[in-house]
Amino acid sequence: MVKKRGKNLPAQDSLDAEPVCKHLRKALDEGSVKKALVNVEWTVCQECQADNKEKNNSDDELVEDPSVWLCLKCGHRGCGRNSASQHALNHYNTPRSEPHCLVLSVDMWSAWCYLCDNEVPYNRSSRLGQLVDYLQRKAKAKSKSTDSAALDEEVKAEIVAENEVKIEDQEEKPKGQAKWDKASSTQNNSTEPTVKGLSNLGNTCFFNAVMQNLSQTPAVRELLNEAKTLKKPVTVPLPDSSSPTNVEVHLEQQPGPLTLAMWQFLTEMQETKKGVVTPKEVFSQVCKKAIRFKGYQQQDSQELLRYLLDGMRGEEIQRVSLAMSKSLQNTLDEEEIKKIVKDSEKRRTIPNFVDHLFGGELTSTIMCEECHTVSLVHEPFLDLSLPVLDDVIVKKNSQKSSAPAPERKEEEENDDGYIKERDEASPGASKHLQKKAKKAAKKQAKNQRRQLKMQGKTVLLTDVAKQECSEDEEEIAPNNTESEANTRPDDEVPIADGLNTMKSDLSALENGSETIESAMERVTEDTDLDTSGHNTESVEMNAMELVRNMENNNNNNTDVNKTLERTEGSGVDSMEATAAVDNGNADTVCVDDTEAANGLLDCSAASMDNELTNSLNRLKLSSDIEPTQVEIEILPDQQQPHTQIYEVINEDPKTAFSTLSERKDLPLDGYSVLSCLYQFTHKETLTGNNKLLCNVCTRKQASRLNNSNKGEKTFVYTNAKKQMLVSDPSPILTLHLKRFQQNGFNLRKINRHIKFPEVLDLAPFCTSKCKNIPAGESRLLYSLYGVIEHSGSMRSGHYTAFVKLRRPNQQLCEMVLKGVIPEVSGSEPGQGSWYHISDSHVQAVSLSRVLSSQAYLLFYERML
């Protein structure tokens, strides 16, 4: 009995049946390409090579090596459109009977169709994928042979040159002077910057690109050398409540395994004479911190960078905390020591080299338009994730209601990313696939109904939230204070997501669809939300306000999921709210959600609701209280949280949103990093569902109601203005361009070129009271020294690095190590040469080639 061929075909065959590019069949000729690439130089444009031979260029003239594109019809090798000659584009424009529109970049291994003017994912076509695999194998084999030959010649030349120098020195100088010069030259050579390739351990290009940029950050090596020094005195500021203000500890323990592996890697990159380094030890330590990187799968460079920095940060904080406990054990009790160490970790007063180099601070300013009360929310960051807007998204959203289904499918094919509905079945799919798609659609609808049902049940908490916890009344009542203002989160990532999840878990428990253990596990996980490098909202100080804003947390699902995943192996965020006004008295309310969780696990199911409600009620402050200093702290079950400071200030509303320099003259032309920063820091208006819960206006209305003998209290929501600016710039500024976007089940990558400058002025995006800036300075300049580029699509791609080889910035190192800020900032970037590194392949490039790359991560260092 013969089986039907189409019945058990895999899902990938349905993708191959409909290639992205409709010109693929006529524009691809495997035989001609293989014949044309016999005994030729792959990485050189054949027309430029012929022109150079005719012109006989001199050796002192620097000729740029542009990117080479291979015609997949005839095997022609031409330079790209970013070069001066554009031989590949001219080859396509030459009239022929058959199109030569399909080309392949031999540097990035990405296919492009000139007719479609779009990238072609070669993994969706068996013919194109097999040809690209064949070319990659041939290119690797050829590069290994040429690299080994070139390496032998370089080694021989170095040996001859060293022997000649030794002979001349021995003849001209005395013996003692020659020995001293030899030792000093060896030391100078070890600190001289170098560029080396990295071995690909198996789909680890995302890791290699990050390590290349970190290896060209000289301050990292200086800080690691200092951290490796044992018995080094470290001064740790203690909380204000303790008797001593500072404590000096001596670090007698070695740094953690990840920190040591990083130090060994940077030392090998700087001192080894090998052309290629294998970063196996560092990668294995990262995999131990975050098991998601195991298995040699394609990963994200920005996530790898965050896991790496957070891992080293957590190890250093743990080492300093142990030294603190040991130094205080002779003067304080064990319980007091634990409290001090825990409070220091929560307030982020424990010094560590990661925060010193990459850490900065953002300030979100919120002003009520009714009473003009100004509140500030301070939060730290390690990198800035900038939104990348694309006109394709706006166009598709505007045409969703009017365009029919066939036109939508045509738009998806012409788009520059991969977009596919998860519940969509192809027209030629089998009955099994169609049935599977229907089940997925039903499951999605069921989940949506359950979410709506859960949101409806959480409204019941508003009545419970009005009651005061007895413990909090005893602690707050003596001072009769009240917090000034609360904010409702807008459509960005909210810091109250963990508390919203607690209320959702309570509704699930009422419905009987979830156990206590699973609910509390998700509560402790969701409250550990990492807010570094992402937009976060102000601290929620009222349980009723949190309940009413659960429906506003659905827009940035990708960032929330991404951030939650980062909490597996690193320190996580906590919130510290501080309201400072005229009265100097202070009260503190501490809520430990992990301790509450442990207590709830011991309770029965009947007492679960009451305990969880009490934990939520602790966030609601008494309405009888005058404004003083109030602190709300949620202590996570992690080593080192990121801290947020909420304060209400008396400031002139006219200067509340002032910046370090004017924003009017910014060149916001097209798609650029300046446009992304402007969008990230633009002033918003909180209206509608995002209105501000202002306690000042609420207190005024409550006083009027009391005069009219109406006992029921109502909360006042007002329109407000909000702006997020940089208040403490980091020495190393890392910018993450969010090219990968997810809207529901739609996945896409924005392949559009984003302009980025060599010198970036961050002053228009900083507050007027920015820290660590000389007095009277109106500029904050950063110099570009590293770029991570991603080429490819959502489903497959390749990460490469551009690094600037330069001498270390001594002023920046002194600022990071000693905290010395020079009075005058630098105005010109340091001299250096740029290199493009793709795993083990290193190539010198020009600055124009760097600025034309498709950047995903940008590394800037402060100019001092």
Curated annotation (Swiss-Prot):
It is found in: Nucleus. Zn(2+) 1 binds at residues 21, 23, 113, 116. Residues 432-452 have a biased composition (Basic residues). GO terms for biological process: cell division; chromatin organization; mitotic nuclear division; positive regulation of DNA-templated transcription; protein deubiquitination; protein homotetramerization; proteolysis; regulation of cell cycle. It comes from the Eukaryota. Residues 162-196, 397-497 are annotated as: Disordered. A zinc finger (UBP-type) spans 19-139. It holds the Pfam family zf-UBP. Residues 162-182, 406-425 have a biased composition (Basic and acidic residues). The active site is at 205 (nucleophile), 798 (proton acceptor). One of its GO terms (cellular component) is nucleus. Zn(2+) 2 binds at residues 45, 48, 79, 87. Zn(2+) 3 binds at residues 71, 74, 91, 100. Residues 183-193 have a biased composition (Polar residues). It catalyses: Thiol-dependent hydrolysis of ester, thioester, amide, peptide and isopeptide bonds formed by the C-terminal Gly of ubiquitin (a 76-residue protein attached to proteins as an intracellular targeting signal). Specifically deubiquitinates 'Lys-120' of histone H2A (H2AK119Ub), a specific tag for epigenetic transcriptional repression, thereby acting as a coactivator. Deubiquitination of histone H2A is a prerequisite for subsequent phosphorylation at 'Ser-11' of histone H3 (H3S10ph), and is required for chromosome segregation when cells enter into mitosis. Regulates Hox gene expression via histone H2A deubiquitination. Prefers nucleosomal substrates. Does not deubiquitinate histone H2B. Belongs to the peptidase C19 family. USP16 subfamily. HAMAP family: UBP16. Homotetramer. This is Ubiquitin carboxyl-terminal hydrolase 16. It comes from Xenopus tropicalis (Western clawed frog).
